[in-house]
């Protein structure tokens, strides 16, 4: 497929594209076509709401959204930048959040990337088979540990 010229012009004007990964508005077919055409989202986030959170087999949290993009063929570092660094820059908070630089707010998540096959679905119930999953090990907010997996050691 091709990307609508109006969409490309919007990007040239500075419109930011977020894939809005939620149960009601993310389509795997459209995502695959966009990625194949070289049209990557600027920001990768969830568009999850309280009534849709933790509903398997949909991308029910950000680690699963990241895992879905791995299955779609995106490079891990590209995904992480779209989840951290790019949103921080777009919000005018570059160097303050979304980075591990000294002096930045220490909001940190540590994951274990595990080989595990599972299925995610989109709002049309189209499926993608994922072969890797990010499993949270530790979460820090403003430098304070908020969550630590019982078998994770600092």
Task: Describe each model-derived feature in a short phrase.
Residues 1-17, 25-42:
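Histidine/acidic residue-rich metal-binding segments in metalloenzymes
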Residues 2, 58-61, 131:
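Short acidic-hydrophobic sequence patches enriched in Asp/Glu that either
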Residues 9-12, 101-102, 129-133:
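Solvent-exposed alpha-helices and their adjacent loops that cap or buttress functional pockets
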Residues 14, 44-48, 71-75, 132, ...:
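Short, surface-exposed, polar/charged, turn-prone segments marking secondary-structure boundaries
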Residues 16-22, 70-71:
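C-terminal amphipathic alpha-helical segment
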Residues 20-24, 49-51:
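Active-site beta-loop-alpha junctions enriched in small/polar residues
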Residues 29-113:
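His/Asp/Glu-enriched, well-ordered alpha-helical/loop segment
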Residues 105-154:
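C-terminal cap of metal-dependent C-N hydrolases
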